[in-house]
């Protein structure tokens, strides 16, 4: 049986705030605003179909991209879907329903960060909340990019301070879920290198 963390209604406003620097705009123009700041991060991770598409179109290849063939809960265009299936990526699929973070997603992310391969994680369900465990699991010096709907792209530099901020948010999520099984997720996040 899968263990998961559900985003409670009262914490949803927290997820609407950018977790890093918001670069406003649309498309490739937005990518060009921060492209110069991507000087060899430890890992580059993109979360979201449109963000991944525009990075690839700009010639920027994330180490890990996390997509679900949807944007704003609607199917992406065939151009976006096809481009995001770039042949440089090995694909891994994972189930993760909307509004939830599953232990399967977290384990898949742990494996992705341990790999040297370029990976496309295809989420059957929704990838929106994947940003949280991505930031926690990414090595310091990594950059996480994700779309802020109708606003632009959020640039998150992974530092120990940022990880502490996200861990505090995770603790709120876990305490709101009040499920002893969630210790399993906490252990994975705390000791992911041993899994």
Curated annotation (Swiss-Prot):
Coiled coil: none
Entry protein name: GTP-dependent dephospho-CoA kinase
GO molecular function, a single term: GTP binding
Pathway: Cofactor biosynthesis; coenzyme A biosynthesis
Residues binding GTP, per UniProt: 49-50, 68, 127, 150
Assigned protein family: Belongs to the GTP-dependent DPCK family.
Keyword annotations from UniProtKB, A to Z: Coenzyme A biosynthesis, GTP-binding, Kinase, Nucleotide-binding, Transferase
Catalytic function, reaction form: 3'-dephospho-CoA + GTP = GDP + CoA + H(+)
First-level EC class: transferase
Function statement: Catalyzes the GTP-dependent phosphorylation of the 3'-hydroxyl group of dephosphocoenzyme A to form coenzyme A (CoA).
InterPro entries with a match to the protein in the record: GTP-dep_dephospho-CoA_kin
Biological process (GO), any one: coenzyme A biosynthetic process
Highest taxon listed in the record's lineage: Archaea
EC number: 2.7.1.237
């Amino acid at each position: 049986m899968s263990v998961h963390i559900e985003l409670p209604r009262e914490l949803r406003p927290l997820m609407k705030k950018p977790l890093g620097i918001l670069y406003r705009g649309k498309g490739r123009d937005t990518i060009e605003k921060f492209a110069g700041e991507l000087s060899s991060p430890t890992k580059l991770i993109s979360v979201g179909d449109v963000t991944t598409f525009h990075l690839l179109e700009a010639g920027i290849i994330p180490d890990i991209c996390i997509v679900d063939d949807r944007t704003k809960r609607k199917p992406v265009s065939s151009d976006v879907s096809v481009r995001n299936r770039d042949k440089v990526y090995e694909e891994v699929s994972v189930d993760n329903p909307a509004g939830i973070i599953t232990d399967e997603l977290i384990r898949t992310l742990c494996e992705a960060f341990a790999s040297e391969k370029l990976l496309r994680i295809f989420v059957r369900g929704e990838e929106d909340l994947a940003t949280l465990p991505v930031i926690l699991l990414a090595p310091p010096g990594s950059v996480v990019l994700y779309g802020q709907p109708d606003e632009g792209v959020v640039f998150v530099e992974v530092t120990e301070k940022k990880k502490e901020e996200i861990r505090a948010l995770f603790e709120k999520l876990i305490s709101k879920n009040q499920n002893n099984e969630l210790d399993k997720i906490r252990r994975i996040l705390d000791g992911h290198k041993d899994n």
